[in-house]
Curated annotation (Swiss-Prot):
Family according to the record: Belongs to the class-II aminoacyl-tRNA synthetase family.
Protein name: Glycine--tRNA ligase
PANTHER family registered for this protein in UniProt: GLYCINE--TRNA LIGASE, GLYCYL-TRNA SYNTHETASE/DNA POLYMERASE SUBUNIT GAMMA-2
Binding-site residues for substrate, renumbered to this chain: R98, E164, F211, T212, Q213, A214, E215, E436, P437, S438, F439, G440
Described function: Catalyzes the attachment of glycine to tRNA(Gly).
Native source species: Methanothermobacter thermautotrophicus (strain ATCC 29096 / DSM 1053 / JCM 10044 / NBRC 100330 / Delta H) (Methanobacterium thermoautotrophicum)
Cellular compartments annotated: Cytoplasm
GO cellular component, one term: cytoplasm
Catalytic activity field: tRNA(Gly) + glycine + ATP = glycyl-tRNA(Gly) + AMP + diphosphate
Documented EC number(s): 6.1.1.14
Any single biological process term in GO: glycyl-tRNA aminoacylation
Binding, ATP: 196-198, 206-211, 323-324, 440-443
């Protein structure tokens, strides 16, 4: 069993300036957290490390979009209609709860994905009462998780705080496609705040109303979901918990990436590659391999936009296995939906190696109907119809009795006909499919702190890798003699100017100062002592094993650069 301690971790994190409850002097507000000086530095280092993986190494580009979005954009994405949690309320004390969570707490049953009526019946059949006062609970209803606001002083335009960063990438897709010279595949990332008005956020950093995401949207040809670098990761071991094994309750299975792909456990090569990349990132920042597993979404919990989705989960002692990353194949849902709602063609033209003769289904506008109906717009509408996916038009007419073009013009079954035609084509137009790794930065930081804390009875410290530690080196004069203090201050100044996050500490005994630095995860301590004044060398101490070596002052920077990695 993995040995971690939530209470001890959070005690140290609060005490030493990593994480604090927000608005403490006003009794606090659930679902919000402050990052103290060390926490904010750690967070920025992790986000920058993420950029190294996804922007520098993968060659993706980062954009930044507004955190407030208009209602029509989120209507198109499905969030207005589908971004809901099941809620119930106590009839006596009026406290509200997530219905699936209160059932799971009371019965141990996993009920995620069940319909509201089913949850209501379970609450009734099991006699589940309010945890606070024992009162009866109401029927279960859907509660939309988005924060609503009004845009502009007149208050006539509804907006929402964004529930994810992804939509800010999908909406400017036409400009992004042009930037990438109209070629697939390409990747775009965004890091920033997202917002979800959680019903009852009682799990600290695990369930926040304002949280930080790092998301990549990789646009790929639906017919070619491969990855050029798969060979580099094919032997990586993944601890998988596929949907089938969950339903059989048969536990996880360790497989190489190549084995998982060949067995059809993971749906595509590109998705498998990104599971491996996520694991490599987490291990790089210091989360141990045995604390991680990859759980596939069950059919009942699969997001409305996904055909395959895996959560990277981390073990915790207080919350069990928690999701810290979601990696999904979103198919063409987002681009197709935004195309339909906005009237913009968000397809990509993929050129064939040589022209092909094909038979295809074509739409034939009836100008005798469109002319009187749309007058001056008729010719443009006829042209626009020829650019729309014919299957999309036929499906809408069959299922809904109408097709809405460009979000405005209603096309009825009598307005068009369909025919099979033969033509020579030089390429095909497709909606790209999207592979999305979505990282919950706050949960990752919590997981890292939880699994980094060492409390062996003699010392308590965060064993953070040097490249993510918020303070990289502390400089200590052995005693408070002026010559030692001045030399230590000069070394600290030089380290900062050389790109290190360094601090100077002369308060208390040398043992107490080592302990203080260890506790916050400082990997290296430089001690200025009597020998320093004689021969220009300092003691360089390693946090993890307390080993010490003598280093010349002029060699300190290159030595630390090598150790930091």
């Amino acid at each position: 069993m993995i040995n971690v301690n939530h209470e001890r971790t959070m005690t140290v994190a609060r005490k030493r300036g990593f994480l604090w409850s927000s608005f403490e002097i006003y009794s606090g507000v659930a679902g919000f957290v402050d990052y103290g000086p060390l926490g904010a530095t750690l967070k920025n280092k992790i986000m920058n490390r993420w950029r190294e993986f996804y922007v520098v190494r993968e060659g993706f580009y980062e954009i930044e979009s507004p955190t407030i979005m208009p209602e029509e954009a989120l209507k198109a994405s499905g969030h207005v209609d589908h971004f809901n949690d099941p809620m119930t309320q106590c009839k006596e004390c009026m406290d509200v709860y997530r219905a699936d969570h209160i059932i799971e707490d009371a019965t141990g049953r996993d009920v995620e994905g069940l319909e509201n009526q089913e949850l209501t019946e379970i609450i009734s059949d099991e006699g589940i009462r309010c945890p606070r006062c024992g009162g009866h609970l109401t029927h279960v209803w859907s509660y939309n998780l988005m924060f609503q606001t009004l845009i502009g002083a007149r208050g006539k335009k509804t907006g929402y705080l964004r529930p994810e960063t992804a939509q800010g990438i999908f909406i400017p897709f036409k400009r992004l496609l042009r930037f990438f010279r109209n070629r697939l595949p390409f990747g775009v990332v965004q890091l920033g705040k997202s917002y979800r008005n959680e019903i009852s956020p009682r799990q600290g950093v695990i369930r926040l109303r304002e949280f930080t995401q790092a998301e990549a949207e990789i646009f790929v040809d639906p017919e070619h979901k491969t990855h050029p670098d798969f060979e580099e990761v094919k032997e990586d071991i993944l601890r998988l918990y596929p949907a089938g094994r969950q339903m059989e309750e048969s536990g996880t299975v360790d497989m190489t990436a190549a084995e998982a792909l060949e067995a059809g456990v993971i749906s595509s090569e590109v998705l498998t590659y990104h599971l491996c990349l996520a694991k490599r990132f987490l291990m790089d920042i210091g989360i141990p391999e045995d604390a991680l597993r990859f759980r596939q979404h069950l059919p009942s919990e699969m997001a409305h936009y996904a055909i395959d989705c895996w959560d990277v989960e981390a073990f915790t002692d207080s919350y069990g296995w928690i999701e810290i990353i979601g990696i999904a194949d979103r198919t063409d849902y987002d681009l197709r939906s935004h195309s339909q709602h906005s009237g913009e063609d968000l397809r990509v033209f993929i050129e064939y190696d040589e022209p092909r003769r094909i038979r295809k289904r074509a739409v034939k506008p009836d100008m005798g109907k469109l002319g009187p109906k749309f007058r001056k717009d008729a010719a443009r509408i006829a042209s626009a119809l020829s650019e729309v996916d014919v299957e999309e038009i036929e499906k809408a007419l069959d299922e809904e009795g109408r097709f809405i073009l460009e979000g405005e013009f209603e096309i009825l079954p009598d307005d068009v006909s369909f025919e099979d035609v033969e033509e020579v084509v030089t390429g095909r137009k497709v909606y790209p499919h999207v592979i999305e790794p979505s990282f919950g930065i706050d949960r990752i930081i919590y997981t890292l702190l939880l699994h980094s804390l060492v409390d062996d009875g003699e010392r308590t410290y965060f064993r953070l890798p040097p490249h993510v530690a918020p303070v990289e080196v502390t400089v200590l004069p052995l005693v408070n003699r002026e010559e030692m203090v001045m030399t230590a201050l000069e070394i600290e100044r030089n380290l900062r100017r050389s790109g290190f996050i360094a601090e100077f500490d002369s308060s208390g005994t040398i043992g107490r100062r080592y302990a203080r630095a260890d506790e916050i995860g400082v990997p290296f301590a430089v001690t200025v002592d009597h020998e320093t004044l004689e021969d220009g060398t300092v003691t360089l101490r390693n946090r993890d094993d307390c080993s010490q070596v003598r280093v010349k002052i002029e060699e300190l920077v290159p030595t630390l650069e090598k150790l930091r990695g």
